[in-house]
């Protein structure tokens, strides 16, 4: 519980503020989460526990969807998710130039650049993703990385997909790059998909520890939640 409500209820409340979404559904393999969501007026569906990735779970939960539909995968541990970021990702997919969209934020420390838990992204000039890696990329051959250059960004765990591409994605087995880096988005690049990237200054706060929960609770209470 965070500030008197289940974590997932806070996430649903934040996501519903995005103006681009027609519906919000929680996909889970835990009946306790379904009960918590429904208690606070949300929608939730049970999905098989053996699904290989979050993307596969989204496709399963969505059921029948059209090729032109846009589906957004939002982590269930981020109650401070910015609704404007969700809307920005959806906007990137409106014209059909990209099959997926995601988000990045600047890397601010050498420790984060080196950490395998921080996923780095190299971008093209139109901010399309060229590659995702747990390694520190791009590698500056001649000097220490200039973190102020704008080249060094970390991936945030939010995705939007065009429906037609999502159908193709879940039919493909994990590729060698995905299995090596343990990054499901590499399957999309391996398939030849174009992934639009939205830059944001918001680093996001996932609730993974009691300390994270306490920090988020202070922020929510400070907002008058």
Where in the sequence are the language-model features?
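Conserved core of the sugar-phosphate nucleotidyltransferase
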Residues: 81-175
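Hydrophobic/aromatic residues located in beta-strands of well-ordered beta-sheets
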Residues: 24-26, 71, 101, 129, ...
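Conserved alpha/beta core of the MobA/IspD/sugar-nucleotide pyrophosphorylase nucleotidyltransferase superfamily
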Residues: 147-225
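Short phosphate-binding loop-to-helix
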Residues: 25, 31-74, 78-91
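Short, high-confidence coil segments that cap the C-terminus of an alpha-helix
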Residues: 21, 67-68, 96-99, 193
